[in-house]
């Protein structure tokens, strides 16, 4: 395989300077109506164009059936990564980065794990395993692995995969994904002029959809993963299992990564017989699951409650029958109608992914207009297919929060500082975390260190309170890192450890209080029931109304 010649840093800087000059020149005569075309023609792909100049010799594209994380293709990619003098793994989850780090470490390969929340580094590290957002485009690698690349279409994070596929400087890149992403990802690679080899792998274990619908709790067996689509539903089902004397691990999106890992270890070691999870289980978590049971077949996607799509069903169902542990994986659902729906989805071909997410081009920050205006104008632009712009609603929401205190925020009028603030990844639905973020926006110039977050009194109790506090600890680390503040590493490690221990206590001491009950009559609701009021109470209220 031939080595590539990377373009020098000065070339990139020169090109950026040319575009900045054209931006300023453009502003002398163009109104905001005309800027749409300018963004499309000259700016929208500027970051990608710069990255395209770093050409690679060859890419190995691995298209794997249904779930890609632990089957043959991914194993080959990681085996190749072990041989690299300098290599990197990029994936969607901190847990996946940790898993790769531990595999390399256990094989005697000095490695580093790098995420937005922490860094663990061995001496003389050769391999960096990180979340996709932490990709380093200034480094030159022998081998790189980009995992779950079908997420190029994700409206929130997809631009990170787009940038990595186009911009990583490596002699050999393994891109692992589902078959549905083939057209979109190969289009990106052809933009660079890179050569590629496509390797397709099939699932090694059979996947069987059972004939008889699952009945709760009678049908529960060791090795089952019961899938629902909200944290409340996870704790509800786990509480019902507890009443039946069945110990269960729980996995959901807002659970801190270390707690997820501990819950997984309980299941893997056999200390819990069942796992109850949201669709977070579908994203590469390596668990000894014999059977996936869809307790729910509908999810709320932020806008509407809808049925699961073909890719969602296949991604989750594919967790059943772990390679080299079970010969066969099984899938089931509650009720005949739900089982028929899941069976139908499993037989359908996935629709090809046709969109590729495009990130906000920071070159636009040089425009002499307020930041929110620039972002809103960019948001209104329709890019050339297959590109689709990343969602910017959350950063606009944070901008609105910060604008209320603009006189108290040093650097508010500096668009690059402000963009660094509002693009900090936080849970904007957690009011306490947003308040902590605002405090950091106001206070960050005052000292070399940020103030430690507090647990807060508030109205939150128990588990929710400590999950929020953990998110505040993550924010402390991320904001400190973004603004080059000194991080109190010892304190942070101790606080994380204490908080993780407290959350584990809440999850282990009893979940019966989380069982869903009707808000009117307080009777226990049916398993997987999506509403807060039972049918009899709803019908009664309808008659009265």
Protein language model regions, located:
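Conserved interdomain hinge at the start of the Helicase C-terminal
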Residues: 76, 81, 160, 202-240
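Conserved two-lobed SF2 helicase motor
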Residues: 123-138, 267-286
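Inter-Walker segment of RecA-like/P-loop motor cores
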Residues: 104-140
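Conserved helicase ATPase core of P-loop NTP-dependent helicases/translocases
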Residues: 113, 119-122, 236, 247-250, ...
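Post-DEXD/H (motif II) to motif III coupling segment of the RecA-like Helicase ATP-binding lobe
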Residues: 150-202
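Conserved segment of the helicase C-terminal RecA-like domain
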Residues: 178-181, 287, 291-347
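Non-catalytic terminal extensions of ATP-dependent helicases
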Residues: 1-71, 360-545
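Conserved strand-helix element at the start of the C-terminal RecA-like helicase core
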Residues: 86-97, 174-176, 182, 219-244, ...
């Amino acid at each position: 395989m031939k080595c590539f010649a990377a373009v020098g840093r000065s070339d990139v800087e020169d090109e950026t300077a040319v575009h900045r000059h054209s931006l300023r020149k453009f502003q002398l005569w163009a109104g905001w109506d005309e800027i749409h075309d300018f963004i499309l023609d000259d700016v929208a792909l500027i970051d990608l164009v710069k990255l395209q100049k770093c050409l690679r010799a060859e890419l190995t594209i691995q298209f794997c059936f249904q779930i890609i994380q632990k089957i043959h293709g991914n194993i080959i990619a990681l085996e190749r990564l072990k041989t690299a003098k300098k290599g990197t793994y990029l994936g969607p989850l901190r847990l996946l980065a940790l898993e790769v780090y531990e595999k390399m470490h256990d094989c005697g390969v000095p490695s580093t794990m790098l995420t937005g929340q922490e860094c663990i580094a061995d001496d003389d590290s050769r391999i960096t395993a990180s979340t996709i957002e932490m990709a380093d485009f200034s480094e030159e690698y022998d081998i790189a692995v980009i995992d779950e690349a079908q997420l190029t279409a994700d409206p929130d994070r997809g631009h990170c995969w787009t940038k990595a596929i186009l911009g990583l400087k490596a002699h050999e890149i393994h891109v692992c994904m589902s078959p549905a992403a083939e057209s979109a990802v190969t289009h990106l690679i052809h933009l660079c002029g890179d050569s590629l080899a496509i390797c397709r792998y099939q699932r090694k274990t059979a996947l069987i959809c059972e004939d008889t619908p699952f009945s709760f709790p009678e049908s529960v067996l060791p090795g089952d993963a019961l899938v629902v689509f909200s944290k409340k539903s996870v704790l509800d089902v786990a509480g019902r299992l507890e009443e039946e004397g069945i110990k269960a691990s729980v996995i959901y999106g807002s659970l801190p990564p270390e707690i997820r890992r501990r819950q997984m270890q309980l299941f893997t070691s056999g200390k819990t017989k069942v796992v109850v999870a949201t669709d977070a289980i579908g994203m590469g978590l390596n668990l000894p699951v014999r059977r996936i049971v869809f307790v729910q077949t509908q999810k709320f996607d932020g806008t509407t409650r809808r049925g699961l799509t073909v890719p969602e069903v296949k991604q989750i169902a594919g967790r059943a029958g772990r390679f080299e542990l079970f010969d066969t994986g099984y899938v089931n659902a509650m009720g005949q109608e739900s089982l028929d729906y899941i069976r139908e989805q499993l037989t359908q071909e996935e629709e090809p992914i046709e969109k590729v997410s495009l990130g906000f081009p920071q070159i636009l920050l040089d425009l002499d207009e307020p930041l929110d205006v620039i972002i809103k104008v960019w948001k209104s632009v329709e890019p050339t297919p297959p590109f689709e712009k990343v969602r910017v609603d959350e950063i606009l929401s944070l901008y609105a929060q910060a604008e209320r205190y603009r006189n108290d925020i040093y650097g508010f009028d500096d668009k690059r500082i402000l963009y660094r603030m509002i693009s900090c990844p936080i849970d904007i639905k957690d009011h306490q975390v947003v308040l902590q973020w605002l405090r950091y926006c106001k206070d960050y110039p005052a000292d070399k260190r940020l103030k430690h977050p507090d647990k807060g009194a508030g109205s939150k109790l128990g588990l929710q309170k400590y999950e929020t506090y953990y998110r505040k600890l993550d924010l402390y680390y991320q904001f400190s890192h973004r603004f080059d503040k000194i991080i109190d590493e010892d304190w942070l490690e101790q606080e994380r450890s204490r908080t993780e221990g407290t959350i584990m206590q809440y999850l282990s001491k009893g979940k019966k209080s989380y069982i869903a009950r009707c808000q009117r009559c307080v009777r226990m609701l049916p398993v997987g029931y999506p509403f807060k009021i039972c049918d009899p109470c709803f019908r009664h209220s309808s008659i009265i109304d």
